[in-house]
């Protein structure tokens, strides 16, 4: 039984689904761009449910359609908005072309003529209604040029945007025929007769029907009689219909009543002539110039309510209120001190954004508005409700100048008095843009959000700068307590080691804001002293969340900027320290180099020739100053240095003082006669020094035996000429010992280097007395300068040799003193 019910319900379900798809496609046609596609997909899915068709490739079209739908749904919001704006622009262009082709008001248009290319942000519906009511001038076509001598067909060509023909040539498209006066009188009589026979006043009858009758070539008796059903239907049925609508509007909703209250637009008689002239020629024969856009329009322009200046409708709809801004008086005294605080003053200014009414562009009178006096005829669109309070506009009388009796006559005189902004005939800029209040409210809300962000920045700045100052001065007792708890109880000003305190304080501030109100409402004073006490109102919860989120973001940005600034300062400090360290090293190096130069200068001063009367320099001074060059010279003396010490002795000789020439003058003949000329071009080598090791050791033992006498070492080194004789004997002994040990010519090189060591021990040099050429001395100097410094063992041996030389010098001095005595 259940199966039979299932079998019975299945077909009905499929049929109902098909019917629902059909109904849905029929009802949703034209409303949703995706409705047809969804319905077609539903039907396709029913058709392609068979698996065998999907195997053959005939099915699966629904999958492709679903993929196409998903692709359409993936478009971004910006793309949808751009597509919507493009569609709206195309629709506006099409509607504008249609309106200019089919609609007009007294020869003017209901859409702009392209004088201004900006955004049309005025309310187009309100402007259209005001133009149809003849309270605002229509958008006349402006002429770039105008001449009073133009003929009618030239005026028609200029008004229609065609090239202006010559005065004596009428183009075929501008030819017209004046309506015969007989036909006009017949139409007038027929309309008067029809009006007299009508028993019910014409209230809401469509004027298009009457215009068709008036413009038809049928005689007056062709009109239906009032007793005919057509006439009764046209005259009485609208009346009963309006009563029914009135009764129905009392019981219907507000929306229906608003729709019914909108006045109905009617088409007035289509008559292209006014007083026998084409309507274009009648309008533009006395054209005037708009003082703002400098185009020529018919004389029926808007007039300012204050100074009675003409202004076209396109210029009028461009004038609007200024954007919301703070009051001007607040800008003047913005520098004045505000005891309430800078943040509160800024909040008050942001909340008090104002937008003054537009001022007159001519006399700068506020509450700018215009008044419009329409032409004495009526053409185009009108409202059906206007016929009750005005003369019958459906009659041909409206096409004549007799209608001007019901309106204010247009004269050349200007209005002597200004009209009030609340006058019913005055149209202000606020009426054209009634959304100015909403824009002001939006601007104030935006300013409030910006003020909240500024407050967050100020709060973050205060929290970051409050490390060095106490929190009790500004009433942040509870905030400071929370910060102290987060910072480990360190709340004393100037506490070191609080690098993360700004972030902790900021988040402590936010945590304190989110805390329940019971923690902060214990004391009224504490509650009023808080910067931003928590608000628990459910109505403003979203605003509070937004404000706190903005505050957290502002604090994060502020902390990031502060961290970046601190890193930059540390980097600058490190660079400065490196620069100072480099300068200090450079100065130390320069000082070291200057000290070395001073030592060289002192040594060169010692090497200069001295007077023979000066005392001799002791050997202790020569052991302190290092030598840098080997002075050239000859002499016969015993080599007292080992092969490893030869280079050191050669370099130390230059620092010792030069010996006066009187000491060695007697020695030169004997030295030159006892030994052959030396070869100074070859530098002294350790191989040459090995030959004099026995002589050095024997002479050292001799000197040690002689130095045991205590009286000799204590004698002063004095005497000038008498010291030459013992030095003579000493050099002769050294030469004899050297001759015994030498076996080849290499001994000459050793003897050549012996005077340098002798002069080092005795602090006297034979550099100034040698007969060697300058080239040889230069070679010896260059060879000595290349040698390296001695090792530790060589320096010790050198010091021992210097002591031996000193004792030998003392022995010679003592012998010299004994011989003289």
From Swiss-Prot:
Residues 22-32, 224-238, 395-411, 478-489, 598-612, 660-676, 693-709 have a biased composition (Low complexity). It is found in: Cytoplasm. GO terms for cellular component: cytoplasm. Residues 1-61, 205-272, 323-347, 384-422, 466-502, 514-541, 562-726, 739-821 are annotated as: Disordered. Its main location: cytoplasm. Residues 34-44, 323-332, 562-591, 626-639, 744-754, 800-821 have a biased composition (Basic and acidic residues). Belongs to the SIP5 family. May negatively regulate the snf1 kinase. This is Protein sip5.
